[in-house]
């Protein structure tokens, strides 16, 4: 369901922008689902390394790591944190989420649902920040929900079927907790929401979505608890800069 080489140059949802300024310094965060550890194509891991090197992020919030983390980190010189129970082998091929950083790690951020959410503190220019990598289930999914013959209200009800909505309920308390503490410890979240963005389904864009305005729950819930979408903060016009991803430089995935 998830396209190969999904990439966001700045993290998707955060309490601060993709680039953070403190003491005249900045850092760049990248959120990326590399699809099955990058192993679905020939030389996939090497291509992952090449793309990361081109973008040169300071921090990477990775999804679908699946054992490729140590190779990527060693090739590029990043510190590496696997979102899994303490003591899990870093090359475990069943572990989804991970964090890479040029800066030193602080304390682990563990949850009861490490396949969906977890991360680490990172110390940046003397400032402690929290970084969370997350993954929401891809079901229910439709490539063109505007063509399903449903109203906005019916689409929101449809969104609650299958797995994604129930998964969000399990990890929502963690997001609420860290958002409430963000005045003391800033928090950045990046990953794979497996959902259209409500900011791309507004009144400004309804003409390309069958006149539908849909406040998609999987992204709207972050706004409701105080997070900002850093991509949309930096690129406020969703028609000129749609929040899409790509699996190669010739083909866009029009929603995710």
Region roles according to the model:
Residues 2-6, 19-75:
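N-terminal, active-site-proximal structural segment of metallo-dependent hydrolase catalytic domains
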Residues 8-16:
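Bacterial N-terminal signal peptides
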Residues 35, 66, 135-137, 193-196, ...:
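Catalytic metal-binding/acid-base residues of hydrolase active sites
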Residues 160-193:
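His/acidic metal-ligating clusters that form di-metal
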Residues 28-31, 59-63, 98-99, 130-133, ...:
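Structural recognition of the beta-strand scaffold that forms the well-ordered cores
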Residues 81-99, 178, 182-183, 197-256:
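Active site of divalent-metal-dependent phosphoester/diester hydrolases
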Residues 41, 59-145:
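Structured beta-strand-rich core segments of catalytic domains in phosphoester-bond hydrolases
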Residues 26-36, 128-158:
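Active-site-proximal beta-strand elements of phosphoester/diester hydrolases
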């Amino acid at each position: 369901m998830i396209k190969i080489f999904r990439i966001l140059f700045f993290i998707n949802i955060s309490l601060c922008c993709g680039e953070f300024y403190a003491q005249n310094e900045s850092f760049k965060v990248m959120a990326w689902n590399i699809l099955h550890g990058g192993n679905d194509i020939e030389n996939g891991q090497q291509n992952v390394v090449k793309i990361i090197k081109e973008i040169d992020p300071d921090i990477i919030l990775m999804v679908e790591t699946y054992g490729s983390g140590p190779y990527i980190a060693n090739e590029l010189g990043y510190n590496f944190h696997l979102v899994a129970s303490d003591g899990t082998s870093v090359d475990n091929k069943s572990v989804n989420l991970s964090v890479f950083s040029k800066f030193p790690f602080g304390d682990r951020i563990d949850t009861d649902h490490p396949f969906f959410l977890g991360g680490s503190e990172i110390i940046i220019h003397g400032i402690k920040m929290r970084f969370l990598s997350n993954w929401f289930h891809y079901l229910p999914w439709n490539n063109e929900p505007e063509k399903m013959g449903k109203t906005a209200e019916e689409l929101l009800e449809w969104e609650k079927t299958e797995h994604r909505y129930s998964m969000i309920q399990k990890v929502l308390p963690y997001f609420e907790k860290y958002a409430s503490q963000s005045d003391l410890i800033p928090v950045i979240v990046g990953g794979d929401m497996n959902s259209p963005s409500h900011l791309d389904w507004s009144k400004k864009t309804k003409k390309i979505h069958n006149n539908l305005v849909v406040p998609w729950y999987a992204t709207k819930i972050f706004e409701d608890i105080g997070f900002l979408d850093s991509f949309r903060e930096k690129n406020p016009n969703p028609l000129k800069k749609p929040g899409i991803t790509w699996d190669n430089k010739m083909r866009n995935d029009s929603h995710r």
